[in-house]
Amino acid sequence: CRQSCSFGPLTFVCDGNTK
C-alpha cells in the first residue's frame, strides 16, 4: 500500500490494508 493515508476517511488504515 502507499503512504497516502493522510487524505481519506478510511485510508488511515493504509498501514497495510488500503492501497
Swiss-Prot record:
Post-translational modification note: Maturation of lantibiotics involves the enzymatic conversion of Thr, and Ser into dehydrated AA and the formation of thioether bonds with cysteine or the formation of dialkylamine bonds with lysine. This is followed by membrane translocation and cleavage of the modified precursor.
The cross-link Beta-methyllanthionine (Cys-Thr) sits at 1-18, 5-11
Q: Where is this cross-link: Lanthionine (Ser-Cys)?
A: 4-14
Is Secreted one of the keywords?
A: yes
For this protein, the record's InterPro entries field holds: Dur/DurB-like
* Modification sites for (3R)-3-hydroxyaspartate: 15
Chief subcellular location equals secreted
Q: Does the keyword tRNA processing apply?
A: no
The protein's matches in Pfam families, at most eight in alphabetical order, are given as: DurB-like
One of the entry's Gene Ontology molecular-function terms is: signaling receptor binding
Q: Which GO terms describe its biological process?
A: defense response to bacterium; killing of cells of another organism
Give me the Gene Ontology terms describing cellular component: extracellular region
List the subcellular locations.
Answer: Secreted
Tell me which UniProt keywords the record has, alphabetically.
Antibiotic, Antimicrobial, Bacteriocin, Hydroxylation, Lantibiotic, Secreted, Thioether bond
Crosslinked residue numbers (Lysinoalanine (Ser-Lys)): 6-19
Segments crossing the lipid bilayer: none
- Job description of the protein: Is a potent inhibitor of human phospholipase A2. Exhibits only a weak antibacterial activity against B.subtilis, and does not display antimicrobial activity against S.aureus, S.mitis, E.coli, K.pneumoniae, P.vulgaris and C.albicans.
Which family, according to the similarity comment? Answer: Belongs to the type B lantibiotic family.
UniProt name for this protein: Lantibiotic duramycin B
Look up and give the organism this protein is from: Streptomyces sp. (strain R2075)
